[in-house]
C-alpha cells in the first residue's frame, strides 16, 4: 500500500467513529425532542413552575398542573390566591411570566392567535345598547373573519346556548344579571374553541341562573369534547362540574386531583370542608 493510501486509511479510521458519534447524538436529540412533543400533545394544557411577579409582589410562586383534553378543570382558592392571574396567562392576555405553559403544544399567545382559546372574564357584560341577537351577531362576524357560513353556524349555536327565546331580540339593558351572563357564556362558547377559560362563570347569580350556566358548561364539554378551565368559590358547583381541580393558596398549589379524592385525603365530609382545612387549617 502506498504511503498516501495508508495515511488516508488512518484518517478515515479516526474520523468515521467521530462522525458516527455526532450522528448518534443528533439522532438521540431528535428522538428526545419528539418524545417531549408527544408528551405535550397528551395534554390540552401543561403548566410547570409558573411564576408571576407584579411590582414587588409575587402573585404566582411555581404552579404546576396538567389538563387533559375534554376535561372540565377547576382552579379554586380564596380571594387573592392567584386564580384570575393564572387564567389570564392561560388565555394569552398576560404575556410576561416565568415558567412553562403550553396550550395544545403552543404557547398561550400562539394558541390565542390560532383561535384555540376563548376567555370569559368575571366582569364581562354585553353591549347594552344592542339586543341579545345583535351582540351575538357582532361577535359571530368578528370570529368568522368574513366566512358567511361559519358566521351563521356560530350565530345559530349562540342563540341555542343562550336559550333566551324571544327575549334575544330585546335590548340587553333590559336583561336580568342571569340573562346577561347566559348571553356572555353563549358568546364565549359559540365559536367552539378547543379551550374555554371561564372566570367565575356563575358569580353573583341566583340559584336558577347558576344551574342553567352549569348545564350549559357540561353540555358543551360533552357535545364538542371541549376542554374547559374555570374558577369558582362555590365548592358545591366545583364538585358538580369538575373532573379534577387544583386548589391554590398564596400563589402555590396546595392540592390537586379529583374532588372526591381531595375530600377523602383530607378526611372531610365534602369539598368545602376540605377547602377550609387546606387553606385555613383545622379550626
Indicate where each model-derived feature is located.
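Conserved ABC transporter NBD signature motif
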Residues: 99-115
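ABC ATPase "signature
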Residues: 256-257
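Conserved ABC ATPase signature
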Residues: 171-178
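Helical segment within the ABC ATPase nucleotide-binding domain
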Residues: 211-223
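Catalytic Walker B motif of ABC-type/P-loop ATPase nucleotide-binding domains
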Residues: 196-200
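Conserved ABC ATPase "signature" region
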Residues: 137, 141, 149-167
Amino acid at each position: 500500500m502506498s504511503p498516501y493510501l495508508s495515511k488516508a486509511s488512518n484518517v478515515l479510521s479516526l474520523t468515521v467513529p467521530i462522525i458516527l458519534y455526532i450522528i448518534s447524538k443528533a439522532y438521540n436529540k431528535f428522538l428526545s425532542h419528539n418524545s417531549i412533543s408527544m408528551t405535550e400533545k397528551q395534554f390540552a394544557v401543561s403548566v410547570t413552575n409558573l411564576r408571576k411577579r407584579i411590582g414587588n409582589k409575587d402573585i404566582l410562586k411555581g404552579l404546576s398542573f396538567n389538563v387533559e383534553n375534554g376535561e372540565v378543570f377547576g382552579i379554586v382558592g380564596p380571594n387573592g390566591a392567584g386564580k384570575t392571574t393564572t387564567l389570564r396567562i392561560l388565555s394569552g392576555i398576560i404575556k410576561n411570566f416565568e415558567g412553562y405553559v403550553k396550550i395544545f403544544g403552543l404557547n398561550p399567545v400562539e394558541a390565542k392567535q390560532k383561535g384555540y382559546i376563548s376567555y370569559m372574564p368575571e366582569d364581562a357584560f354585553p353591549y347594552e345598547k344592542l339586543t341579545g341577537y345583535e351582540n351575538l351577531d357582532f361577535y359571530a362576524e368578528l370570529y368568522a373573519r368574513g366566512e358567511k357560513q361559519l358566521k351563521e353556524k356560530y350565530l345559530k349555536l349562540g342563540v341555542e346556548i343562550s336559550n333566551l327565546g324571544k327575549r334575544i331580540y330585546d335590548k340587553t339593558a333590559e336583561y336580568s344579571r342571569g340573562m346577561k351572563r347566559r348571553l356572555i357564556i353563549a358568546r364565549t362558547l359559540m365559536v367552539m374553541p378547543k379551550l374555554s377559560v371561564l372566570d367565575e362563570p356563575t358569580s353573583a347569580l341566583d340559584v336558577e341562573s347558576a344551574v342553567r350556566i352549569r348545564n350549559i358548561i357540561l353540555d358543551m364539554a360533552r357535545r364538542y369534547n371541549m376542554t374547559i378551565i374555570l374558577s369558582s368559590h362555590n365548592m358545591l358547583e366545583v364538585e358538580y362540574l369538575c373532573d379534577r381541580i387544583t386548589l391554590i393558596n398564596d400563589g402555590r398549589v396546595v392540592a390537586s386531583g379529583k374532588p372526591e379524592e381531595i375530600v377523602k385525603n383530607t378526611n372531610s365530609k365534602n369539598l368545602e370542608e376540605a377547602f377550609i382545612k387546606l387553606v385555613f387549617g383545622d379550626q
